[in-house]
Amino acid sequence: MKTNYEIRYAAHPEDAKSYDTARIRRDFLIEKIFVPNEVNMVYSMYDRMVVGGALPVGEVLTLEAIDPLKAPFFLTRREMGIYNVGGPGVVKAGDAVFELDYKEALYLGSGDRVVTFESKDASNPAKFYFNSLTAHRNYPDRKVTKADAVVAEMGSLEGSNHRNINKMLVNQVLPTCQLQMGMTELAPGSVWNTMPAHVHSRRMEAYFYFEIPEEHAICHFMGEVDETRHVWMKGDQAVLSPEWSIHSAAATHNYTFIWGMGGENLDYGDQDFSLITDLK
């Protein structure tokens, strides 16, 4: 197995508005998440979130404590949320064993233990996407499925944004220090998410897009309300959203995305909305 990581530094909005396409993609887009028998991570300076993925194909992959953590184990001072977006898989955390099927999630609290990822079938490997944030105390590990989620049905087919927001790793379902994660599924014929757009200066966010055909693409919108920019994305890619940025998208096909947040509070509804007509 191989572990790869990179550090992404935070940007001031006054600087970011001058970025060209290449710089925007380099600073905010995370293209390489799933590579066979690799664990790939981005250590972001936005609330020190780690965004990553593991794709075990015939090997057991270990979540290693990368150097920026300066810790004996990855979870020594961190909590994490994991989603399986591939075939059936297994996550082991110390002596605990969790089987995760497609679109099932797992919360792991902080503590010194080894975490491993494996697939049940190498011909249909599991794909583990994860977010991790710093934690001030330990909370119990827990597997969470859509049956456990707080579900909000939003939008309409007429508005091209009919979707179910599955709030899964949130404080309405289980205790966390600062991590919140969920999964939004767009209905066939709907392509817009998070519109009207909002920001939440108390929390940063990361979006991971999947379930979109290879010949289609997602156009993710970011930036300040009056200085928006776009990032064209494919499936199985993620994008960082600073606390000062909107985070919305339209695509050429319906899709699903996993959102993860961390920062000042655990209030999902703490959002500052903008009128669609105010976007520039």
UniProtKB/Swiss-Prot annotation:
Keywords for this protein: Isomerase, Metal-binding, Zinc
UniProt name for this protein: 4-deoxy-L-threo-5-hexosulose-uronate ketol-isomerase 1
Family of the protein in this entry: Belongs to the KduI family.
Gene Ontology biological process terms in this record: D-galacturonate catabolic process; D-glucuronate catabolic process; pectin catabolic process
Role according to the record: Catalyzes the isomerization of 5-dehydro-4-deoxy-D-glucuronate to 3-deoxy-D-glycero-2,5-hexodiulosonate.
UniProt entry tagged with the keyword Isomerase: yes
EC number: 5.3.1.17
Family matches, as PANTHER family: 4-DEOXY-L-THREO-5-HEXOSULOSE-URONATE KETOL-ISOMERASE
Species the sequence originates in: Bacteroides thetaiotaomicron (strain ATCC 29148 / DSM 2079 / JCM 5827 / CCUG 10774 / NCTC 10582 / VPI-5482 / E50)
Residues at which Zn(2+) binds: 198, 200, 205, 247
Essential cofactor(s): Zn(2+)
HAMAP family xrefs: KduI
Catalytic activity: 5-dehydro-4-deoxy-D-glucuronate = 3-deoxy-D-glycero-2,5-hexodiulosonate
Signal peptide: none
Encoding gene, per UniProt annotation: kduI1
